[in-house]
Curated annotation (Swiss-Prot):
Protein name: Small ribosomal subunit protein uS11
Domain of life according to the entry: Bacteria
A cellular-component GO term for this protein: ribonucleoprotein complex
Organism: Bradyrhizobium sp. (strain ORS 278)
GO molecular function, one term: structural constituent of ribosome
Key word RNA-binding present: yes
Complexes and interactors: Part of the 30S ribosomal subunit. Interacts with proteins S7 and S18. Binds to IF-3.
SUPFAM superfamilies, alphabetized: Translational machinery components
Stated role: Located on the platform of the 30S subunit, it bridges several disparate RNA helices of the 16S rRNA. Forms part of the Shine-Dalgarno cleft in the 70S ribosome.
Length: 129
């Protein structure tokens, strides 16, 4: 009886025409989350979940593959238009944005929402290579 209740529910297909793509590109990874207008997550992907490990996660190609994966998931829900919010200093920002546009989404706006400290925490030490 309890085993029947523990079964995983299938995600129901929502019909959402427009949403917001949050592209977070750090120095180590790129995550892309597509939400509806209220902020409820519809689909997400990252370079790490696409099988890239280590320093390959931070490449523009890994961000492009993650964007193609998340766009496929979002189009199953009927999404066609996106607002894009880009955050972070990483190298996968532009390639993820280009991959979302190439997947067939009409991008209505692009915003940079990277947080900038007003002299907050002390930064990391300089790398000497």
């Amino acid at each position: 009886m309890a085993k029947e209740a523990a079964r995983v529910r299938r995600r129901e297909r929502k019909n959402i025409a427009s949403g917001v793509a949050h592209v977070n590109s750090s120095f180590n990874n790129t995550t892309i989350t597509i939400t509806d207008a209220q902020g409820n997550t519809i689909a997400w992907s990252s370079a790490g979940t696409m099988g890239f490990k280590g320093s390959r996660k931070s490449t523009p190609y890994a961000a492009q593959v993650a964007a193609e994966d998340v766009s496929k998931k979002a189009q199953e829900h009927g999404m066609r238009t996106l607002e894009v919010e880009v955050a972070g200093p990483g190298s996968g920002r532009e390639s993820a944005l280009r991959a979302l546009q190439a997947a067939g989404f009409t991008v209505t706006s692009i915003r940079d929402v990277t947080t900038i400290p007003h002299n907050g925490c002390r930064p990391r030490k300089r790398r000497r290579v």
